[in-house]
Amino acid sequence: MYSCTSPSGIEVSLNKPEIWEKFYPKTEMIVTRKRGRVIFPHLDYNVKGLDPDSLYSIYIHLERVDGIKYKFDAGEWKEAGKGDPILPIQYKEHPRGKRTGTEWMSEPVSFAHLKITNDPENKDQKLILAQSLHKYIPVLHIKQLDPYKGTFQMDFHGVEFRLEATQFIVVTAYQNEELTKLKVHHNKFASGFRSNGKRRLSSESENSENSPPKRSASAISSLTPPAISPPMDYTQQNPYFFNQNFFSTPQSHQPQFAAHSANAQNYNNFGAQNGAQFDWNVYYQRQWYWQQQMMMSGGIGQPQMLNNGFPNL
């Protein structure tokens, strides 16, 4: 229930099983459309039995447990009818990318950044799609690097681990009062409820758990424009070196500037007021070129310590 061992000897267990034990089997997870909601208790795993020197990549996805849609009635969850059509699987790679077995086993493998949403149009890489009033179980995948090809086999889905205690029902509002109290007690960032059990105002609960509060428009407008542009998102350039999901369509290798066009224009306008103009596209192209040179010089098969879009992880 709290741990699982594969035939090859790889063992996966929950880092804090005592917390999951208090929630199971009535665990509920809030889902929101815009910003998503962090999964709590967090999906933190301990991994043992890996080859210390081999490279591995770890993924996670949410799997529907059954074809049933549920309802909360008389203090318990009951079958409400046939479930909605099952959605395609979304594999989410751990932001640390490829690491040796020693590195993965040295500390918990945490997916605390992962949020669930019910908006199929939301493309945020930290969000994973789930359907309300359906039961899910997180599935952990561990993929080993092919030592002969120097890359992952595209048809190899790795070893899968399902821990029964992590099952949960997706809801838009907590149904179980006792579970609500547990959430507030164990999670100081619990959104939607104050510590006294009362609901927060909509303006208070809009931010998801662990998310920083929004800044006011007046505060943002008063900021002085930065001297340089924010760093480019290089994760869109090369699907091999940048921890891309191997189950998704490879991204273009050409630099993309659309995400920064508005900022570049603003900064150019700011520079014009001071009698200067700067070609931001040329700046990005040069930065992208030298970044590519640095990556290629590192050699294939070496862990790439690059920006993966998830700070502090």
From Swiss-Prot:
Tell me the Pfam families matching this sequence.
T-box
Keyword annotations for this protein?
DNA-binding, Nucleus, Transcription, Transcription regulation
A GO cellular component entry from the record: nucleus
Q: Give the UniProt record's GO annotations in the biological process aspect.
A: cell fate specification; nematode pharynx development; positive regulation of DNA-templated transcription; regulation of transcription by RNA polymerase II
Do you know which SMART domains this protein is assigned to?
TBOX
Signal peptide range? none
Subcellular location(s) of the protein: Nucleus
Q: Which InterPro entries match?
A: p53-like_TF_DNA-bd_sf, T-box_DNA-bd, T-box_sf, TF_T-box, TF_T-box_CS
Q: Which residues bind DNA?
A: 19-195
Decide whether keyword Metal-binding is in the record: no
Q: Where is this region: Disordered?
A: 193-228
Q: Does the keyword DNA-binding apply?
A: yes
- What are this entry's molecular-function GO terms? DNA-binding transcription factor activity, RNA polymerase II-specific; RNA polymerase II cis-regulatory region sequence-specific DNA binding
Database matches in PANTHER family: T-BOX PROTEIN 31-RELATED, T-BOX PROTEIN-RELATED
Q: What does this protein do?
A: Transcription factor. Required for mesodermal induction, acting redundantly with transcription factor tbx-38. Together with tbx-38, acts by inducing cell fates in the AB lineage, thereby playing a role in development of the anterior pharynx.
Q: What is this protein called?
A: T-box protein 37
Q: Identify the gene encoding this protein.
A: tbx-37
